């Protein structure tokens, strides 16, 4: 998958290097689809839906909500969800690995967009079937540009986590949880304001959520996820316990946090 990201990223960088704003182009999707899901059939999925702005205020922080109107007991239960942005230099924004502790999956997050684009949510079942949901959003300038500040201080401050569970908790029912981790999520496409050299990619790669030491959700982040990654998702606690998260960045640093879940 990483190799495919790099191939598509190189192609897109060449294609978009002189473009800062353009209307969404549906013809880009076949290229992205072939790179990530070569020759695999994919069905439209009315059960994958979005809540998103028609035009985002900032391409660096585009709010996105995704819902899957099925449970993990359904015949075509989605086990893996890929979020792709057709027109981004690196299209894959994040991959979500789902479990039955999520019930009907509902997620709010924030992504980067370099230009107007279709956003794709591709769901994969345990037996490899693929299902597609799409939404069009207008936005610009979220992946490149210039950054400033003391890079050493920014890196030192990275990794602080907030993890909250909404109360009151009704055990056995969907319960909202919110995760935020402080991190610049450098894309590798941004330039230093002073030197004008490219700032190396520096981002959260993975986050693993557990409840009472049992998996809830694993996330593979890409640089298409916004600065200070934000997730709001529902999970189903059956008893009091501990919701925990373990995150890793591409420098190999590990960050941990947990919160009690109780009435």
Give each language-model segment a name.
Residues 136-142, 260-263:
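Short beta-strand edge segments in extracellular beta-sheet folds
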Residues 99-108, 223-232:
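Aromatic sugar-binding surface patches on proteins
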Residues 125-132, 248-257:
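Short acidic/polar inter-strand loop motif in beta-rich domains
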Residues 32-61, 152-174:
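N-terminal edge beta-strand
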Residues 51, 63-71, 176-184, 192-197:
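Short edge beta-strand/loop segments characteristic of extracellular beta-sandwich folds
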Residues 8-17:
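Bacterial N-terminal signal peptides
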Residues 114-118, 174, 238-242:
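Extracellular Ig-like/FN3 beta-sandwich strand-entry sites
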Residues 25, 140-162:
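Low-complexity, Pro/Ser/Thr- and charge-rich linker/hinge segments at domain boundaries
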């Amino acid at each position: 998958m990483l190799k495919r990201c790099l191939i598509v990223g190189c192609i897109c960088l060449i294609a978009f290097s002189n473009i800062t704003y353009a209307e969404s182009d549906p013809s880009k999707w076949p290229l992205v689809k072939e790179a990530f899901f070569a020759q695999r059939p994919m069905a439209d999925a009315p059960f994958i839906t979005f809540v998103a702005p028609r035009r985002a205020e900032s391409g660096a922080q585009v709010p996105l909500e995704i819902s899957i109107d099925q449970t993990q007991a359904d015949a075509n239960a989605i086990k893996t969800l890929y979020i792709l942005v057709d027109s981004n230099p690196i299209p894959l924004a994040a991959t979500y690995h789902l479990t039955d502790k999520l019930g009907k999956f509902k997620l709010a997050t924030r992504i980067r967009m370099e230009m107007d684009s279709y956003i794709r949510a591709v769901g994969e079942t345990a037996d490899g079937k693929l299902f597609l949901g799409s939404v069009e959003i207008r936005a610009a300038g979220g992946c490149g540009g210039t950054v400033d500040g003391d890079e050493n201080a920014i890196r030192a401050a990275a990794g602080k986590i907030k993890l909250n569970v909404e109360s009151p908790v009704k055990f056995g029912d969907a319960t909202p949880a919110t995760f935020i981790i402080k991190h610049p999520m450098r894309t590798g496409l941004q330039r230093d304001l002073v030197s004008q050299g490219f700032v190396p990619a520096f981002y959260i790669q993975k986050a693993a959520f557990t409840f009472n030491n049992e998996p809830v959700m694993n996330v593979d982040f890409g640089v298409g996820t916004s600065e200070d990654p934000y997730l709001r998702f529902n999970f189903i606690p059956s008893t009091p316990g501990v919701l925990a998260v373990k995150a890793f960045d591409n420098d190999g640093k590990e960050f941990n946090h947990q919160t009690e879940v109780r009435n």
